[in-house]
Amino acid sequence: MEINKRIEEARKVMGKYKVDAYIITSSDYHQSEYIDDYFKGREYLSGFTGSAGVLVIFKDEACLWTDGRYHIQAEKQLKGSEIKLFKQGNLGVPTYKEYVVSKLAENSKIGIDAKILLSSDINEILSKKKYKIVDFDLLDKVWNERKALPNGKIFILEDKYTGKSYKEKVKEIRKVLKEKGANYNIISVSYT
């Protein structure tokens, strides 16, 4: 089966990086639920097309976690592959983080794409045992037909949608900065 071949290719790359497991989520750089094809590596490696799930590839097994919306779909799409399905939300089913901790010995190496996996998830795993995190994009190494990241143009929303022009907003921020004696303002968005 094609999926098993892809998993084996992933393991070969994991061997080059000397990692004991690699974690692949269904997210992009912004933790969006609906992602561009470039980020559908979990789908590429597992064959599971649901929008939510985590694939963990170990040296000796591959496991997929998904929620109740996709249990039946995942069973069908994983059939014939080596991937073991963990049905999130069912009694006694460990989370992928719990399973990684139960399976890997202390000082094991876990591969991740740190641009995608949440630091809070990694910190939760690291709080249980001492592991070495190895940051690399496994998908770039195994997914030859991977589409390029979209490269669209940005545009300015009209004032009727934003309430004020960006120039007015910047002017207001600069006024407050001056009043407070501040040199800069950091604007950030949280997706957690």
What do the PLM-derived regions correspond to, one by one?
Residues 100-146:
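Hydrophobic or amphipathic alpha-helical targeting/insertion segments
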Residues 57-61, 78:
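Short acidic-glycine loop/turn motifs at beta-strand connectors
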Residues 7, 11-43:
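Intrinsically disordered, low-complexity, positively charged segments
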Residues 191-192:
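Conserved small/polar residues in nucleotide/adenosyl-binding loops
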Residues 142-182:
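Flexible inter-domain linker/hinge segments
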Residues 182-188:
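Extended, Lys/Arg-enriched charged tracts that mediate electrostatic binding to polyanionic substrates
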Residues 68-99:
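Compact, glycine/acidic-enriched structural inserts
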Residues 19-20, 107, 182:
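Short, high-confidence coil segments that cap the C-terminus of an alpha-helix
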